[in-house]
Design a protein with these regions (language model features):
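Short amphipathic alpha-helical segments and helix-helix/interface helices
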Residues: 24-26, 68, 105-106, 124
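Short gly/ser/thr-rich secondary-structure transition/capping motifs
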Residues: 19, 59-61, 99
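Alpha-helix capping/helix-boundary segments
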Residues: 12-13, 42, 105, 122-123
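Active-site neighborhoods of divalent-metal-dependent phosphate/nucleic-acid chemistry enzymes
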Residues: 76-121
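Residue-level signal for well-ordered alpha-helical positions
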Residues: 19-20, 49, 129-130
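Short, well-structured N-terminal submotif of metal-dependent ribonuclease cores
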Residues: 1-38
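Acidic, PIN/NYN-like endoribonuclease modules and their adjacent C-terminal/linker elements
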Residues: 2, 38-39, 110-141
Length: 141
């Protein structure tokens, strides 16, 4: 497992945007500087929930866009087609009963042998029950 390779879940990205900064590094803290990855599917989720993000943040659109710019510059996006079918099947089996939409994030974690950064406790519990324990915990907790 590569502790310097962290896969960022959509809920983490959303929380960073709602705070108005979009700064993932600030959420991590001073304990290290892992490389941050996410599947391209995050773009779809951000677009799908953009109105909700605007309402939840209470920020002017200009500030939210500045936070989005910061967030996107801190992430390395990985095309889902780069992940093997076998890994996709494995990830789907891990996620299917909790939330199949998390499959791209878990698949990328398995593909990169990294750590998954999520604050979805229901998902974490389900993944742990299935033997997946590759989670990232920020140093700034």
């Amino acid at each position: 497992m590569n502790a310097e390779c962290v896969i960022v879940d959509a809920n983490i990205a959303f929380k960073c945007l709602v705070t108005g900064r979009g700064d993932l590094r600030e959420r991590i803290g001073l304990g290290g500087h892992p490389q941050l990855f996410t599947p391209r599917f995050l773009f779809v989720e951000l677009f799908k929930h953009k109105e909700r993000l605007i309402r939840a943040s209470g920020l002017p659109e200009e500030d939210l866009l500045a936070g989005l710019h910061t967030l996107l510059n801190q992430l390395t996006f990985v095309h889902e087609a780069d992940i093997s079918t076998e890994v996709w099947i494995w990830a789907f089996r891990l996620c299917k009963e909790t939330d199949p939409k998390d499959t791209p994030y878990v698949a990328l974690t398995l593909h990169l042998n990294g750590l998954f950064w999520t604050e979805d406790n229901e998902l974490k519990t389900a993944l742990l029950a299935r033997g997946f324990n590759h989670f990232f915990e920020p140093w700034n907790k």
